[in-house]
Amino acid sequence: MTLNTVLSGKNIPEDIYVIIEISAHSNPIKYEVNKDLGLLFVDRFIPVPMFYPCNYGFINKTKSNDGDPLDVLVHTPYPILPGSIIRCKPIGVLNMFDESGEDYKIIAIPHPKVCLEYSSINDICHLSPTLKQQIIHFFKHYKNLENNKWVKIIGWENKKNAEKIILSACEKFHK
C-alpha cells in the first residue's frame, strides 16, 4: 500500500487523516511525499536553524490554491514519525501568503479516540498562546535565507473556516 491510497478522512471535514511528512521538533529538513510515487523524499535542507513546532503534513486527496495537497500542522504530546497517518480534528487555520500565493496551514489535534489529552480543545482560541506565537514565528522566518522565497502572515481563523477550507480543497481535488 502506498500513501496515495489514503483517504482524506473518516468524516470530512470534522474527522481527517493527516499524512505526516515532518516530525515536530526535528532537524531543519523539508520532506515531501512524492505524489506520483507515494513515497517520502527530501525536498530541501532549510538553511535557517529552526525546527517545526508541530508535526507537519497534509490531507490526501485535497488540492489547495498552490496545487498541492492541503497543509496541516498537528499538535501532539510526542513527535510522530514521517510517513505515519494520524486521525485528527481540525481546530483552526493560519492564513498566510508566500511566493506561490495564498497558503493555508490547517491546525489540528489528534482525534479524541487517538489521544484524550486534547479533548477539551475545540477551536484555535483554546490552543496555548505560546504555541500559536511559536507557529507564527516559525513560518515568518523559516524561508529567510532562501532566495526569492518569502512569507506574509495574515492571521488565525477559527475551526469553522478551517472546515470550509478543507471541504473546498476536497472539491478542487475531485474536479
UniProtKB/Swiss-Prot annotation:
Keywords: Cytoplasm, Hydrolase, Magnesium, Metal-binding. Substrate binds at K30, R44, Y56, Y142. It is found in: Cytoplasm. It catalyses: diphosphate + H2O = 2 phosphate + H(+). One of its GO terms (biological process) is phosphate-containing compound metabolic process. Gene3D superfamilies: Inorganic pyrophosphatase. One of its GO terms (cellular component) is cytoplasm. One of its GO terms (molecular function) is magnesium ion binding. Mg(2+) 2 binds at D71. It is an enzyme of class 3 (hydrolase). Its EC number is 3.6.1.1. Its main location: cytoplasm. Mg(2+) 1 binds at D66, D71, D103. PANTHER family: INORGANIC PYROPHOSPHATASE. Catalyzes the hydrolysis of inorganic pyrophosphate (PPi) forming two phosphate ions. Homohexamer. Belongs to the PPase family. This is Inorganic pyrophosphatase.
